[in-house]
Amino acid sequence: MMISEIRQELTDHIIPFWNKLRDDENGGFYGYLSYGLGLDKKADKGVILHSRILWFYSNAYMTLGGDELLDNAKHAYEFIKNNCIDYEYGGVYWMMDFEGKPADTMKHTYNIAFAIYALSSYYRASGDKEALALAYRPFEDIEKNTLYEYGYREAFDRQWRLVDNEALSENGLKADKTMNAILHLIEAYTELYKADGNEKVADRLKFQLGQMRDIVYTPDTNALKVFFDTAFNLVGDIHSYGHDIEATWLMDRACDVLGDEDLKKQFAEMDLKISHNIQDIALEDGALNNERDKNEIDKTRVWWVQAEAVVGFINAYQHSGDEKFLESAKSVWENIKEYIIDKREGGEWYSEVTFDHTPHDYKETVGPWKCPYHNGRMCMEVITRGVDI
């Protein structure tokens, strides 16, 4: 039942919505659609948004087939190849204007990771060896320009001089290093290794998994730390429920792709503990709360947190056989259907909904961070995992 509903959501709602945002005049996809569904054709175009769109169409094609999906993937690929990559200094830009010229030339490890993720997927979908070569450019740029004794630095100007990490700092905190960046480097390197089997990529992927296991994970609480200074000292007291449940299945996936049996066992045990913890403390009224900051719980229902919860709970069920995880996945999907999916003509999913089910009308429908990657990926993961309820 759930698989058929989610397949329909992908094919009849999410994909058609994003198809309409293709910009054939200036390349790429339009960068902003308001809560009121007003399209701004001259809005800046986020590079993270475009990497995620490229990943989405590439994987939708590999999951469903269909020439239109591959064509839209190619359209996103051409925009990234021709506009977003900095061929002079390396990496990718942070933001383009509506015509495809650089609007913000900051280099960020998180953003560059998504370019690797997307280009690797497009290579797998299309077989275009140029895309694989382009995926290795940002990989080498990260390895050359961001490494230091504690792993990977995150925020730089165009010429790789360090700048404040404002892009990934939140809650009034300044964080030099983030769990978020490490997680999405793991995600990106997993996809690149899956595409090409390069042992250097495998080695760096194992290094990052080790950082998550040995530094970011807290065994006493079965939670992941969020923000750090340059020496990996904790900054703030935040628990991000969505990132925890997303990390469980992404780390399991990385170990599966690496084929390392010891790592598989270590992370399966750790990730199940994290999943149980999230189920116990964050699942409320059929949906996942957002985060804890010190003693305050933010109960906002954020679109991506709900999508990752469905995948994470299904993954936990597959590793444990515990049907309570399936029940949790089902409850979150039912909540998504009822309250997160935007049923207005021309809508997709609301960005955020309050605990009592009121959409936040100040949060855009499409923007630099509001994309088809989390909800689209949820659909594809449910389809390909084949676990029905």
Swiss-Prot record:
GO terms for biological process?
carbohydrate metabolic process
Q: Which gene encodes it?
A: ce-ne1
Documented EC number(s): 5.1.3.11
Gene Ontology MF term list: cellobiose epimerase activity
Q: Which family is annotated?
A: Belongs to the cellobiose 2-epimerase family.
Q: Species name for this entry?
A: Ruminococcus albus
Membrane spanning segments where? none
Any keyword Cytoplasm?
A: yes
Temperature behavior of the protein's activity: Optimum temperature is 30 degrees Celsius.
Keyword Isomerase (UniProt) = yes
**What does the entry say about activity and pH?**
Optimum pH is 7.5.
Principal location listed in the UniProt entry = cytoplasm
Coiled-coil annotated residue ranges, if any: none
Give the protein name, as stated in the record: Cellobiose 2-epimerase
Reactions this protein catalyses = D-cellobiose = beta-D-glucosyl-(1->4)-D-mannopyranose
Arranged from A to Z, the UniProt key words for this protein are:
Cytoplasm, Isomerase
Q: Which domain of life is it from?
A: Bacteria
What is any Pfam family matched here? GlcNAc_2-epim
For this protein, the activity regulation entry reads: Enhanced by Mg(2+) and Ca(2+) ions, ethylenediaminetetraacetic acid, ethylene glycol tetraacetic acid and citrate. Inhibited by Al(3+), Fe(3+), Co(2+), Cu(2+), Zn(2+), Pb(2+) and Ag(+) ions, iodoacetate, 4-chloromercuribenzoate and N-bromosuccinimide.
- Record-level GO cellular component terms: cytoplasm
